Amino acid sequence: MRKTMIIPTYWCRKTGDPWQEGDAVYDHPTPVDQEGTLERTLVSMKQFSEKDFKLVILICPTTPEVEAAAYEQVLRIVGRAQLNAETYLFTAGDLREITEILRKAGLNDRGVQLLSMFGYSNVRNVCLLAASILTADAALLIDDDEVFELPDFVPRSLEFLGRRVYGDIVHGVAGYYLNSKGQYYDDVRPEPWMTYWDRFGCKARAFDQIIGSGPRLKRTPFAFGGAMILHRELFECVPFDPLVTRGEDVDYLINSRIFGFSFFLDNTCLLYTSPSPRDRQKS
């Protein structure tokens, strides 16, 4: 099975430069004068027992004004990490070149509008595009603020992909995150309003039922965009909805089910996530 891991990394204006009208909005992009968490993610991949995969790092600037600076930062980070993996840097400029090639091949204006690196859903779709270009049978979607703890993460995440389980072919596998406390719950500070809108409590109960109990593999009503493993039959049929600005991961799972694909969560497929407040600034 040909495997491609895609990691989008988000970059914004320098520290102290405010967000401007028209800039993309992400949770915690890295200012281009800082280095963020990407290197930590890449270094944690050195322990992998499975090295037969391609790695694509998708460089996502919040504005064209920081494209060049973001590229230089990522290039330095990748050079220091010295990963033993076939690695590609995918930039907004690369996407523009691909768009022009497809336009000349007959892609209409509506199709061209879908080729964008602005917003989470569009970024996820470019991740799928990169996997398709590299003829991957499996796309592993990972975020740049995660740390791998499992040396066998790659083969573990692919163990059931494409196989029949409970009468259905596994086309999508969701992993999950552990927070700084080693828990799979949202790492949030209690606020008074949560008494009346207990969304984190509801999520915790759902996580206990799906993540915290057996069996290892089970059908899931939720997935996490930075821990999704997709079979080629799925990602070349179902895209992320470009009009969904947040929650694109769960929306993708729902759309996958609508189109007849099965999505499961593997409760042994875990990553640690912890964006560094020292290295990040809110967009």
Positions of predicted regions on the chain:
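A recurrent flexible, glycine/aromatic-enriched loop bordering the glycosyltransferase active site
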Residues: Q209-A227
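Conserved donor NDP-sugar-binding/catalytic core segment of glycosyltransferases
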Residues: D152-E191
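Conserved nucleotide-sugar donor-binding
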Residues: A136, F222-V238
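Active-site-proximal specificity loops/subdomain of glycosyltransferases
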Residues: V78-L129
